Amino acid sequence: VGGGSNSGGAVLRGFFNDAQMSAMTPRLNPALPTGLDYYPLLAPGERFPLNDPSYAPRLTPRPSDDVTFFQGLLEGIARIEQRGYQLLAELGAPSPTSVRSVGGGAQNSAWTKLRARLLKVPMLTPEHQDAAYGAALLALRGTQ
């Protein structure tokens, strides 16, 4: 399942570059919630899981420790994903029993553990991690 949220990697890169995120990742504690209630957006406006062009980012309070702030952003993104699955379940879709993900974030073990904690399902690593591979499989199945 993919969602078109305006939150995600672009928000993280609005605050940190890849080297900074890589350096902070070993200091994250995915088992211990920060208590921060962020809705990470770079600017007002959200598409999924709610459609509100004026929905405001929620990025305060900003702790002085960048690692805690980084983890709070990741938790906020994971809660958006969690809400998407909740809405799908309310519409009759089955709740996921596991989640597979690809892309840069999928390579971050702390992020994967944090998502598993919030989503309450195992995060699995697909054999092929290129998103185009999955699209090609779907296209192949559609022609058969």
Regions found by a protein language model. Give the residues of each.
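Active-site core segments that coordinate phosphate-bearing ligands/cofactors
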Residues: 1-99, 107-131, 136-144
